[in-house]
Each structure stands twice: as C-alpha cells, then as structure tokens.
Amino acid sequence: MAEICASAAPISTKNTSVEELRRSVTYHPSVWRDHFLSYTNDVTEITAAEKEELEKQKEKVKNLLDQTPNDSTLKIELIDAIQRLGFGYHFEEVIDESLGEVYDRYEMPSGKDDEDEIRVRSLRFRLLRQQGYRVPCDVFEKLLDDKGNFKDSLITDVEGLLSLYEASNYGINGEEIMDKALKFSSSHLEGSIHKMPTSLSRRVKEALDMPISKTLTRLGARKFISLYQEDESHNELLLKFAKLDFNIVQKMHQRELHHITRWWEGLEFGKKLPFARDRVVECFFWILGVYFEPKYEIARRFLTKVISMTSILDDIYDVYGSLDELRRLTHAIQRWDISVGDELPPYMRICYEALLGVYSEMEDEMAKKGQSYRLLYARQEMIKLVMAYMVEAEWCFSKYFPTMEEYMKQALVSGAYMMLSTTSLVGMEDLNITKHDFDWITSEPPMLRAASVICRLMDDMVGHGIEQKIISVDCYMRENGCSKEEACREFWNRVKKAWKCMNEECLEPRAASMAILARVLNLARVINLLYVGEDAYGSSSTKTKNFIKSVLVDPIHSIEYHI
C-alpha cells in the first residue's frame, strides 16, 4: 500500500487552513473504469453444453488418474501437469490419495525405475512437499561429488536442472543442501538459457522469474497452458480440459467482478475521494490470487470489498487526513457505531459508512449460518490495523524516527496481511473452520508473521525514495550506518528466510489445515508478484493490467500464444 507523508511543514498554523496543509500524491485513474459492467449475465452465461462437456472431460481425466499406477513416474508427471494446468482442485482427494502412496514408497528401493534421475527425484520431492509431506532433503546427497558439490555431469541435463530448481524452492531454514541446489541450478540455467531451443528457454525463463512455489494458480495456469501446448509430448485430453475449465471459471469471475464493480461505482469514491487509488479491479485480482475456486465465491466477495476499503483507508491515513481528522477516524472505527460517523468530516464519513456497510453485509450472511462470531474477529483485526496506521501517522506528523524494532512492531500489522488473513476465513463456509482456527490466526503465528514480513519488506524496498514516510529501509540504514543497497540486501535475506519459514509451516504436523494456510501463503504470493522491482498496485497500468487481461478478460482459444 502507498505510504506518502508530509514534508517538514508544521502540522498547523494560525493562518493556514487544513486544506492547504494536506499531503498529496497523484495516482493514475482507474485503468478499467466501468469495463466489467459489460459482463452481464447473458455474456457470462455458462451454457448447458459447456457444463456437459466439462463433466464428460472431467470423468475422462479421473479415469486416466485411476488407471495410472501410483508407483510410476507417469503418475507423478500426470499429477504435476494437472496441478500446473490449474484444474487440480477438481481432483484433490484422488491426488492426495495418490501422493500418500508415493510418500509411503518414498524411501523404498526403486528396482529398475529411473529413481536416480535428477528430474524424477526432484519432481517427486517437490510434489510431496507441496502436499505437506515432511520428506527429507538428503535424497539429493546422491547428486553430490566427493567435495560436497553437485556433480558437474548434471550441468548438461537442462530438464533435470529445471526440476531441481523448482524443488529447491521448497527448502526450509537449516537445509544447506537445498540452498546449494538452488544456487547450482539457477546459476547454470541462467548461464545456458541463450543456448536452449526457444520453447525450453521460455520455460526456464518463466521458472527463473517465478518458481512454482511462488506462483498464483490462475496466472500460472494461463502461462503453463501455452507452454504445455508447445510440448510435443503433451496429453491432448489434459490440454482440452484445462482450456475448457479455465474459460468456464473465467466467466464466473467476470460475473462476480461485474457485481463488485457495480457496488464500487455506487459508492462514487472516484468522485468523492479523488485523492485515493481507484483500484477495485486490481483488488479483485489480488483476492483471486488468494482463492480462485468457484466454491469460494462468497469469501472472494467479502475479502475483495474489505481490501478495497482498506486501500481507501490507507490513502486517508498516509496521503490526505490531518492529524486531528485521523484521530477522530481511529476513534470512530474503535467505537464501530454508525452514529459516530456524524462526528467525522464529510469525506471520512463516506468511507466510514461504507466500511461498516461491508461488515454488516458479511455479518448478515454469516448470521444465517450461525457463524456471526467470525465477524468479531474480523472487526477486531480491522481495528488493530487502523490503530497501527494511527501510530505511524503520529510518527509522521511529529517527525519521530522509530528504531527498526519499533517500526517493525507496527509495520507487520499496518501491512494489512494479518487483517486480510483473518478476514479471508470469514466466508469459507464449506470448511469446518472453527473458533479455534480464528484464535490461532489472530495469535500472530509464525506462518502469518512470515507472510507479513514478506509483505512489509517488499513493499518498503520498492517504496524507498518515492514515499515521503519513514519506512524500514530508512530505519535500517540509520541504525547500521549502511547504504540503501546494503539494507535491501539484508531485507532480501529476511524475505528468503520468511519463505522458508512458510514452507516449513505447511509441512505436517501443521498448526492449521492446509485450506487455511493456503490463504496466507497465497497472500504472500500476490505481494511477490506485484512488488518485485516496482509498486504494480499503485502503478497498475502496465504489468498488472496485462496480468488482469490474461485471467479476467481474454479467454483461451484453440491456439494459444505466450502471454
């Protein structure tokens, strides 16, 4: 989220109005405006023929899964293709059962199978870790020479190196061999990419830019479908089903975004709050990264509205509000009473009433299911968030320079991922999510703190030098007497450790179900996509626009070219 602060001007003077003292920043207008209002029911209708064809092809894929032996290389290759093509959610139980058998046989002698092949060894390891199995990394020791380095003979096996690279991104803290594997595979892939055939070099480049472990399912599927189609050994059944499923789900998402856009247009924030980012489509894309599956439609609607309101609040606290106004807004949100809105200036009242309206909508729907308690947690996390915003605003206006420890204590909250992670569970009605799960996620467990570290540090690294607010880069440089480059190098190391922490938290025994952990993991993946090298949320007219087009505008045709 953007962080813009006042310059050295005092907070107020006798002869200067609040309007003259307001901070300001210029954001580009919405890229999409009312584009998605055109996706009406007749446009996004899924025909009976499409539904029938989907079920027909789905049954064929299931038969293929059932008929392929679990102890074969073909089975793990099939599972990998299904997951990367984006329709693994249809076959979660079958895949889980199959990989369970693979895990049971993991350390058994392989006979004449190609167990020692680097590609297969790495693929099996990755799939099992993705599934949460705590498989040991010593399986890669056989690939080392007498000096403890990876054998030179592996360098020419590009497919093997690529598989090793993907597997090494599932390492956890303390696994030195996985660090070696990542360095070895990535360096040799980068060094030889210009010598590879075009189709292979594209696969390698995509992987180096965004490994599977950090890839958003829908965006990754769109890209992989194109790559998979170019592979001469591709399975035509899988390719056909992937395209059909992608297009059908895209229609569902377009219909959802139509209703979200209509809600947003009704609020008229673009006119009434012109200082704020108008990014509701980008917010929907963000939440699509958290959960894309059709069954999470209600959860997606809830969380999209909450993150959209959070973006507006963020701009009020960081860009526009005076200190007195911000104190009043914070007090009002702590009170959580619609009548308190009368005490706010008009522009804040608009936002405050819309915020309470979103939570009232959620509460009404969850009350019908006897799950109103979930809103107590969600509201409290929003209150905690704005209190952190307020602390940072006080620092900004008083020109207080916090220590790195002081800053991170607030910044891990103000990054909003603690609030969003908790709120992501509210609408997940199909799962047996309990009060215990909400108690766990609001206790700031390691998984959530790691995601918050990734969110905060990646945001701050791209924001330094642009934002006028003191952020982590400034704090670290001041405390350690170092350059921005040295600070960012340290932060990247912290981000890498946080990813490894998240990898480990997803392994059995887990503190929560994978369905819950996946929301936190996916939130980190979105940040990793949008905040590498730039703030592609605040400036969403290029890279982010293309991402959105690929998953929410352009259907997949019979001939699909690279995105």
Curated annotation (Swiss-Prot):
| Expression sites (tissue/organ) | Expressed in peltate glandular trichomes. Present at low levels in flowers, leaves and stems.
Free-text cofactor note: Binds 3 Mg(2+) or Mn(2+) ions per subunit.
* An MF annotation (GO) of this entry: magnesium ion binding
Q: Where is this region: Homodimerization?
A: 320-326, 392-429
Residues annotated as binding Mn(2+) 2: 314, 318
Q: Which InterPro entries match?
A: Isoprenoid_synthase_dom_sf, Terpene_cyclase-like_1_C, Terpene_cyclase_plant_C1, Terpene_synth_N, Terpene_synth_N_sf, Terpene_synthase-like, Terpene_synthase_metal-bd, Terpenoid_cyclase/PrenylTrfase
Example GO BP: diterpenoid biosynthetic process
Q: Where does this protein hold Mn(2+) 1? A: 314, 318
Which catalysed reactions does the entry list for this protein? Answer: (2E,6E)-farnesyl diphosphate = (-)-germacrene D + diphosphate
| Free-text function comment from the UniProt entry | Involved in the biosynthesis of phenolic sesquiterpenes natural products. Sesquiterpene synthase that catalyzes mainly the formation of (-)-germacrene D and minor amounts of other sesquiterpenes (e.g. bicyclo-germacrene) from farnesyl diphosphate (FPP). Also triggers moderate amounts formation of myrcene, limonene, terpinolene and linalool in the presence of geranyl diphosphate (GPP).
This chain's protein is named (-)-germacrene D synthase
Supply the source organism for this entry: Origanum vulgare
State the encoding gene: TPS3
